Structures are given as C-alpha cells and as structure tokens.
C-alpha cells in the first residue's frame, strides 16, 4: 500500500474553544418529521459553508452483468416524492436504470463532515416536469445535450466540438431549442436514507431511516 495514502486521515474534531463540537450531535429525534427537513437543512448548511457544487451526488447503478457503476450527477430537485436529476435516457446510466430501476445516491460534504445516502426505486418524470427544467437551462447546456450522444464513443475532441457547432447552426439564437426526445428527469423515491456525521476517534454518528410497510423507521447504526 502507498504509505502516503495510508497515512492520510482526518480527525473530524470540529470542536470549538470550549471543547464542544461546533455542530450538535446527530440524533434520531431529528428525523421524527421525516428525512426531508433534515436533508434540506444539511444542504443549506453546505451552501453556507461554501462547499463546491453542494448539490453534486454520486449515483450508483448496476450494468447488465451486475457490476456496479458510479458517476457524479447534480440533484435538481428535492421533495417528499424524492430526489430528482436529469439525464439522457440512452446514456449508460439511463439504460442501466431502465433495466434495473433502483439506485443509490450519496451527497458528500467534506468541509462540514457530513454525508447523506439515499436508496430507492426510480421512475421517469412527466414530460411537463422535464420541459419546465429544460427551458430553465442555459442555451449552451441545451445545445450540448443535442450535440452529445451521451456515453457513445467518439473519435476526437474535434468531432465533439464540431457536433456542438452543428447543433448551434441547427438551432439559431432566435429559435426555441426543444427537449431531446431521449432526455428527461429521473426521480429516486427514497426507501432508505442514511445520515452520517463525522466525529473524533472514528465514532461517527449514523442514523438510518427506512420505509417499512408504509411507515418510516429510525435507528442508530454503529460506525
């Protein structure tokens, strides 16, 4: 093992002058009202702490062989229904989620020593939801979605740049850029949500809430 990597660690002290933790201990009582209020609060805290791209999350899927695949995507909505992101449905992740409609996402906010993992079944959102978000995107992002056949091989960077130029010519500035027919939103409906909070000596706080027979259970896990 690389000795430099083996020696890398963080103490997760996050203590003030009085020796107490700057943030209060995570407790099961904080999830009595459900997973969403605390998740929104932690996301707001990450924003205020200046965490880069606080809505970035690692999305886990499995391919046709059962092999796990992960990548970073951006959360574009949180509601009682679940966690929302958008993608090309014909991309690797889109096809994998169509074949196995279950996913896991993890938000990791290192500067505040917090992490949330959400697992659950997925479904495509309505065309209306997709259209509303699509038209809120910058023009360049919409052109990029048309230019890229996501996850497909391409010969060179020059070919990719040429595809973007072609998309810009196809949709001039005065022309509305329509939603790609194979592009849209995917909603993860939470079945399990785990909140993790770093603490000294690796005695981290872990609280998991799970949907069981229509009701949410809450339990503390050992670190």
From Swiss-Prot:
Which domain of life does this protein belong to?
A: Bacteria
Molecular function per GO = FMN binding; pyridoxamine phosphate oxidase activity
GO terms, biological process: pyridoxine biosynthetic process
Q: What reaction does this catalyse?
A: pyridoxamine 5'-phosphate + O2 + H2O = pyridoxal 5'-phosphate + H2O2 + NH4(+); pyridoxine 5'-phosphate + O2 = pyridoxal 5'-phosphate + H2O2
Coiled-coil residues: none
Positions contributing to FMN binding: 71-76, 86-87, 93, 115, 150-151, 196, 206
Task: Write down the EC number.
Answer: 1.4.3.5
Binding-site residues for substrate, renumbered to this chain = 9-12, 76, 133, 137, 141, 202-204
What does the note accompanying the cofactor annotation read? Answer: Binds 1 FMN per subunit.
Which cofactors go with this protein? FMN
Pfam families given for it?
Answer: PNP_phzG_C, PNPOx_N
- Kindly state which keywords UniProt assigns to this record, in alphabetical order: Flavoprotein, FMN, Oxidoreductase, Pyridoxine biosynthesis
* Claim: Methyltransferase is one of the keywords in the record: no
Q: Where is the signal peptide?
A: none
Q: So what family is this one in?
A: Belongs to the pyridoxamine 5'-phosphate oxidase family.
Assembly: Homodimer.
PANTHER family attached to this UniProt entry: PYRIDOXINE-5'-PHOSPHATE OXIDASE, PYRIDOXINE-5-PHOSPHATE OXIDASE
This chain belongs to which protein, by name?
Pyridoxine/pyridoxamine 5'-phosphate oxidase
Q: Specify the species.
A: Rhodococcus jostii (strain RHA1)
